[in-house]
Amino acid sequence: MTLTKHEQDILLKELGPHVDTPAHIVETGLGAYHALFTAHPQYIIHFSRLEGHTIENVMQSEGIKHYARTLTEAIVHMLKEISNDAEVKKIAAQYGKDHTSRKVTKDEFMSGEPIFTKYFQNLVKDAEGKAAVEKFLKHVFPMMAAEI
């Protein structure tokens, strides 16, 4: 189920301060990946730019900044386009295909959804916004996973 315009507006407003500058975009993505790798450090090996890193040093690597930026940009792009189902599917498909070269299984990919949901909910203060985060990620994650 997709977001209503009202839910989209809440999320864009609440996430705005976290994605308003290139530095904030990277910082937001770093937080999401920190949450993912804390829960699943074994996933680090799936990222070519993180080769040789461990949970102890991955967050200081240059490679993680690339992944942090692209994750946040993809989420914001899908959120902004949520009323355009064809565009969201296109973005989700590309993001999902990007994971095929990482040898990520659908189950591994989907295991990130509750982690990212919790992380992004912590960035949102409004209870309605927290529910919208969950609704949004539960909508787009399966679309991305379908391409893996």
Curated annotation (Swiss-Prot):
Domain of life of the organism in this record? Eukaryota
Signal peptide (residue range): none
Report whether Signal shows up as a keyword of the record: no
**Per UniProt, where does heme bind?**
H99
The misc remark on file is: This globin lacks one of the heme-binding histidine residues found in most other globins (replaced by a tyrosine) but has an extreme oxygen-avidity and high oxidation resistance despite this change.
Note the subunit structure. Answer: Monomer.
Q: Which protein is depicted?
A: Globin-3
Q: Which organism is it from?
A: Paramphistomum epiclitum
